[in-house]
Structure formats: structure tokens, C-alpha cells
Amino acid sequence: MSKVILTTEVSGLGSPGDVVEVKNGFSRNYLVPQGFAVIWSRGGEKQIEQIKAARAAREHATIEEAQDLKSRLEAKIVKLTVKAGQGGRLFGSVKTSDIAKAVEESGIGQVDKRKIEIPNAIKATGNHEATIRLRDDIVATISLQVVAAK
């Protein structure tokens, strides 16, 4: 096991500035090369303080923005047009990037595709739901209407 300092938010692991203990291979092969984390060291403690200070400064402004975005997301149904065969079965499935693009095109706002969680794979037309984690404490549930392209 090795200690790493997260530099970006990693789903299921933590937020920027958190010190977490992960398996050696996970840190060496994924987190560090992708830039999601740095190896923990005593000098890294200063980096943690800087990351946390920057996050605290951003949080005050983003709480209101996140609440506003949440209300806009939950008030509107996002329409996705995808290729489908007979019976409403999709060719492939709806991905988080498709949802993020549809949200942006509908004029609601920008959403990071990594923050979108789809509980069950969307492989058919119809109405579905997905959740978007805007912040650690603010989660929006959006309604999706998947329709077949003509």
C-alpha cells in the first residue's frame, strides 16, 4: 500500500488535497500517470494546504451556483436523440459524454461527464434518470428522454 495526495477529484476515492492509501499498482499505473495524484511526501504537506485553501475559496461562490444549476437540471427534461433499431433498442448505449453534451445543448449549463452517474445502462428509448454530483453535498437527479433518430 502506498500513500498518495489527490490533485483532482477521483470518484469513490476522495477530493483534491485528500491523503489516501491505495494499492501500489493503482497509484503507479493509474493515479500518478494520469495526473490524478502525487506520491505522498513530507514536502507534499505544503501542497495539501495550498489545494485546500484554493478549494475553500472556490466553495463559497460555487455553493450558490451549484444550487442554481441543480434546480435548472431538475426542472427540465433533457432530450437525447440516438440511433435505434426496431422496438426502440439502441445501437450501443447512452454514455455520460452524450448526456453532458445534451445538457449543454439544451441550454441548462455545462456539466463534467465524470460527475454523471448512470445507475443502469441506457440501451432502449424512453424515459430514464441519471444523477449528477455537482459537489460532495449537492446531487442533482435529471430526467432523460431518449428518442430514436429518424
Curated annotation (Swiss-Prot):
Record has rRNA-binding as a keyword: yes
GO cellular component terms, A-Z: ribonucleoprotein complex; ribosome
Signal sequence segment: none
Pfam short name (any one): Ribosomal_L9_C
Keywords: Ribonucleoprotein, Ribosomal protein, RNA-binding, rRNA-binding
InterPro entries: Ribosomal_bL9, Ribosomal_bL9/RNase_H1_N, Ribosomal_bL9_bac/chp, Ribosomal_bL9_C, Ribosomal_bL9_C_sf, Ribosomal_bL9_N, Ribosomal_bL9_N_sf
Alphabetical list of Gene3D superfamilies matching this protein: Ribosomal protein L9, C-terminal domain (3.10.430.100), Ribosomal protein L9, N-terminal domain (3.40.5.10)
Biological process (GO), any one: translation
GO molecular-function term, one example from the UniProt record: rRNA binding
Family per record: Belongs to the bacterial ribosomal protein bL9 family.
Function comment: Binds to the 23S rRNA.
NCBIfam families: L9
Stated name of the protein: Large ribosomal subunit protein bL9
Originating species: Clavibacter michiganensis subsp. michiganensis (strain NCPPB 382)
Name of the gene encoding the protein in the UniProt record: rplI
